[in-house]
Amino acid sequence: MSTGLPFGEDVNYWQTSKSSPDSWMEKTKRLILGLGGKVLMEGFGSEPASGRSAFMLAFEIKGDHFKIVWPVLPSRGRNEGAARIQAATLIYHDTKAKCLSAVVLGARAAFFSYWMLPDGRTAVEASVPELAKGIPAIFAAPQLGKGEVIDGEVVE
């Protein structure tokens, strides 16, 4: 099954760090805490049968809930360790940029793609369901069928 994701070797931060994925995730959590946020959940999941794996970080800032699910990119050379480090490094740098934006624009605007909708999907999962092909099914939110509608309220 093709995930549609690029190879890790073709993306920034490939084999640029010796730090463990855990250390990058700890740095990422400190960024969230620095904004006054609260980390709710974190995890790593993999599906040996499909080869898909991803990191997940769920957090709350000022009453809004967010969930980052970041795929580990496939490696041409099957270097899973380097791919995991790269994924955790990318999460950190993505979050760092969004935290800077949040200071000016607010957390919901900055982290909008990770904002949790009432049905449990994030804004990005709702708008680009194809991304679910690149992550383990355990982290993928259920997708709506054609014509289905979710009623829900946005809490301000």
Question: What positions do the PLM features span?
Answer:
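Intrinsically disordered, low-complexity regulatory regions enriched in serine/threonine/proline
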Residues: 1, 69, 73-156
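Terminal, regulation- and interaction-focused segments at domain boundaries
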Residues: 1-30
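Alpha-helical structural elements
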Residues: 9, 19, 54, 65, ...
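Long, continuous compositionally biased terminal/linker segments
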Residues: 17-20, 26, 48-97
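An amphipathic, hydrophobic-aromatic interaction surface with interspersed Lys/Arg
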Residues: 33
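Short, well-structured beta-strand/strand-turn elements
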Residues: 36-48
